[in-house]
């Protein structure tokens, strides 16, 4: 009765839990860390049925979720520094999520914790509902599996065990028979002693008496037989003691032989299992060694996929690992670029610029240039410069161009503290180390001499956005934000991400112009000046770090007179290039990494770009 009462009481206690119902479903937009290329992306997240799923957007829910995790064993960890971020991990799978604000994050965490509590692993009621049946089924199946596997390969041992069972039964019967024999013998001896005592008492007169002459009178033989009768126990005449003893010895010998055989089988089985154990131990050792090696290799590689290992003030990656990861990413990009160039050469892609007179009018910009002839001169070039079309940045453009023409062409000697970092043939790259608030602001200056091209051609290809993707390999995408004049535009471009560094974007004004020669002996000079500006159409965003630039490409054309009355060919022209770059990368990249990347990438850029110009202008009329 008490059991029924306790059962009913426990059932009534569970009723409130049943009536509480399932946890409330939740859905909304969260930022999810996708990968190191795309970073944080907005995703439509749904919390339902103890599972967290995400979709690319709310409109694409009908196409199925992009991913889902069960919350039964999930671990929810709010980030220590980012108040809007929280991480959800299930075994090796980790989701990095960011809410709009800390309150929004806490609401999601509370909802997820509620679903986790009501899941199969977190609720006591769920354990009571599911535990018993699982335990019974698993216990029964486990026992049957063990029994079958234990004796499937042990027929000989099983037969010997059956023999020992038979020997045991025989031995028990023999022991019972011998015990009965010994008990009967003991009873017979006891009865004989009682009977002898009685005979002695009843026949005292039969014992010898003393005569008058001193001699003894002895009793007859019959009295002796009464006093010492022959001991023959009753009821055991049918037992063959000798035969039973022989059989007992044979049975024990059989048991010992069977035990010996069983021990031999077990020793063989033990040897077999020992060999298997040794193999498994060796396999485990090799697996652990391979695992350690794999973990070591993963640590060497850029395996950190989470946001904690990207560039930032609280990055968990050290400077050496940062440099190794950046170098590995740049090597991959170089390999991809080499494959792309090889494919272009194989397919013989057509040039992007037309030949002839149309060459001088690239894109939609007004460069009026007649085909060169001996009668034409440099002064005949009609360029619509920035001074002709006044815009709101005109004064700033004039100042930038004037500064570059004054200071950028100066010699690197003297007190400028320029350091020669790379020298390859005619190309020399100099650097001056400058840091401000921990940010590397090293000015860079490169000089180069390229045969067969003019300064106008080099600057034209450098400025023209229509051919930008043909030679620039670091840009992910770009577009012209505003056209200020025919030779002045504002460009917004996003550079390819080099993990673990953050992605960079640049918003800058790009202008091209010809600098008139002061004297007849001065070389023809063209300049492209790119410097950062602000524009409402390209505001700052959270995905990229906005870099600031002040870059100038200054090109001077030197012409050596041809022999005789021959026309000037590309063999007679030489372009002296001065490339100046002042870049503020922003962010938190280590100084040593930035300097190493600059030392590696700037010479590659200059060689790649000048080779591209030589390739595109080969066989075409000269553009002075």
UniProtKB/Swiss-Prot annotation:
It catalyses: N-hexadecanoylsphing-4-enine(in) = N-hexadecanoylsphing-4-enine(out). Keywords: Coiled coil, Cytoplasm, Disease variant, Endoplasmic reticulum, Golgi apparatus, Intellectual disability, Lipid transport, Lipid-binding, Phosphoprotein, Transport. It is found in: Cytoplasm; Golgi apparatus; Endoplasmic reticulum. The modification Phosphoserine is found at residues 126, 132, 135, 315, 373, 377, 380. Phosphorylation on Ser-132 decreases the affinity toward phosphatidylinositol 4-phosphate at Golgi membranes and reduces ceramide transfer activity. Inactivated by hyperphosphorylation of serine residues by CSNK1G2/CK1 that triggers dissociation from the Golgi complex, thus down-regulating ER-to-Golgi transport of ceramide and sphingomyelin synthesis. GO terms for biological process: cell morphogenesis; cell population proliferation; ceramide metabolic process; ceramide transport; endoplasmic reticulum organization; ER to Golgi ceramide transport; heart morphogenesis; immune response. One of its GO terms (molecular function) is identical protein binding. Residues 263-303 form a coiled coil. Residues 389-618 form the START domain. Changing residue 138 to C: Found in a patient with intellectual disability. The modification Phosphotyrosine is found at residue 372. The keyword Nucleotide-binding does not apply. Residues 1-11 have a biased composition (Polar residues). A motif (FFAT) lies at residues 321-327. An N-acylsphing-4-enine binds at residues 472, 493, 530, 579. Changing residue 132 to A: Abolishes the phosphorylation. Strongly reduces the interaction with phosphatidylinositol 4-phosphate. Increases the ceramide transfer activity. Residues 1-24 are annotated as: Disordered. Its main location: cytoplasm. Residues 23-117 form the PH domain. Shelters ceramides and diacylglycerol lipids inside its START domain and mediates the intracellular trafficking of ceramides and diacylglycerol lipids in a non-vesicular manner. Interacts with VAPA and VAPB. Interaction with VAPB is less efficient than with VAPA. Interacts (via FFAT motif) with MOSPD2 (via MSP domain). The START domain recognizes ceramides and diacylglycerol lipids, interacts with membranes, and mediates the intermembrane transfer of ceramides and diacylglycerol lipids. The PH domain targets the Golgi apparatus. It is linked to Neurodevelopmental disorder with hypotonia, speech delay, and dysmorphic facies: An autosomal dominant disorder characterized by mild to profound developmental delay with hypotonia, delayed motor skills, impaired intellectual development, poor or absent speech, and behavioral abnormalities. Some patients are non-verbal and non-ambulatory. Additional features may include early feeding difficulties, poor overall growth, seizures, brain imaging abnormalities, and dysmorphic facial features. This is Ceramide transfer protein. It comes from Homo sapiens. The gene is CERT1.
